[in-house]
Amino acid sequence: MSRKIARCVFASVALLILSSTGYAAGDANAGKEKANACTSCHGVDGQGSEPNTKIAGMSVGNFKKAMQAYKSGERNHAMMQMFAKKLSDQDVEDLAAYYTAK
């Protein structure tokens, strides 16, 4: 019985490790370095002011969804589409981590 439990624990840990290795989480420090282009419209800390959106404190999911929508053209804003199309997936992850922490 204890061998069966040990195998289950081992399998569970292995699955957790394998499932997390393919995901590149955002790096807030790298995001801070990449955020310079955002400051002219959204402010130094992402607080924004009308008509620009507040991105500080935005959830990672919402930030990523918005950037993808600008990249694909689903959201129509010429300036944001131009910036978003230049961002790699890792750039978006890093920026999301940075602004979520604000």
What are these model-derived regions, one by one?
Residues A66, Y70-S72, F83-K102:
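C-terminal capping alpha-helices of c-type cytochrome domains
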Residues N29, G57, K86-Q90:
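Soluble non-cytosolic domains of exported or imported proteins
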Residues L18-T21:
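N-terminal signal peptide c-region/cleavage motif recognized by signal peptidases
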Residues A28, G46-R75, Q81:
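Gly/Gly-Pro-rich "capping" loops immediately C-terminal to redox-active cysteine motifs
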Residues Y23-E33:
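Cleaved targeting-peptide boundary
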